[in-house]
């Protein structure tokens, strides 16, 4: 089985910034990868399209995926509100790692983050399920709109997304 690839077309205050594509590790975390894939295609009637990156901390990560409240308190999975941590096989090894944001054990919904550095202190707490395939330069450009507290200076949105 070939791991799926999905893409985000990123916009800054409505102006196109560029495309980021991700390989989803369905071979290691099938349930988590499938959730992100289906939210990227919108095939269940809801998902990431039009949502924003509400928290960007330069030298750490870019977080998004709250398509219900747009502020980090919402979002939902394709399996219902929340789903369990699948496993912690994959580690936060460096820039480009795609991992699930959560509010403690077994609280995965739709929020995720893209690491811009190695974040080994998150190993065993957040489920890694993918990595940036192309467009890490776009993620680095997004970082410039972040701040120490995570508030963004401009609105960073997923203008379009889907599966490649």
Curated annotation (Swiss-Prot):
Interacts with protein phosphatase PPP3CA/calcineurin A. Interacts with isoform 2 of BSG/CD147. Interacts with FOXO1; the interaction promotes FOXO1 dephosphorylation, nuclear accumulation and transcriptional activity. Interacts with integrin ITGA2B:ITGB3; the interaction is ROS and peptidyl-prolyl cis-trans isomerase (PPIase) activity-dependent and is increased in the presence of thrombin. Interacts with MAP3K5. The modification N-acetylmethionine is found at residue 1. Glycans are attached at residue 108. It comes from Saguinus oedipus. The modification Phosphoserine is found at residue 77. It catalyses: [protein]-peptidylproline (omega=180) = [protein]-peptidylproline (omega=0). PANTHER family: PEPTIDYL-PROLYL CIS-TRANS ISOMERASE, PEPTIDYL-PROLYL CIS-TRANS ISOMERASE A. This is Peptidyl-prolyl cis-trans isomerase A.
């Amino acid at each position: 089985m070939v791991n799926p690839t999905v893409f985000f077309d990123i916009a800054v205050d409505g102006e196109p910034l560029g495309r980021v594509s991700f390989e989803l590790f369905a071979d290691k975390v099938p349930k988590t990868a499938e959730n992100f894939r289906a939210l990227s295609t919108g095939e269940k009637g809801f998902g990431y399209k039009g949502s924003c990156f509400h928290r960007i901390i330069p030298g750490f990560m870019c977080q998004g995926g709250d398509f219900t409240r747009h502020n980090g308190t919402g979002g939902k999975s394709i399996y219902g509100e929340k789903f369990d941590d699948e496993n912690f096989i994959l580690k936060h090894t460096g820039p480009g790692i795609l991992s699930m944001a959560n509010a403690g054990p077994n609280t995965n919904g739709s929020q995720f983050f893209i690491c811009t550095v190695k974040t080994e202190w998150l190993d065993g707490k957040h489920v890694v399920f993918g990595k940036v395939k192309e467009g890490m330069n776009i993620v680095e450009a997004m970082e410039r709109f972040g701040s120490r507290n995570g508030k963004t200076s401009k609105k960073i949105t997923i203008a379009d997304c889907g599966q490649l």
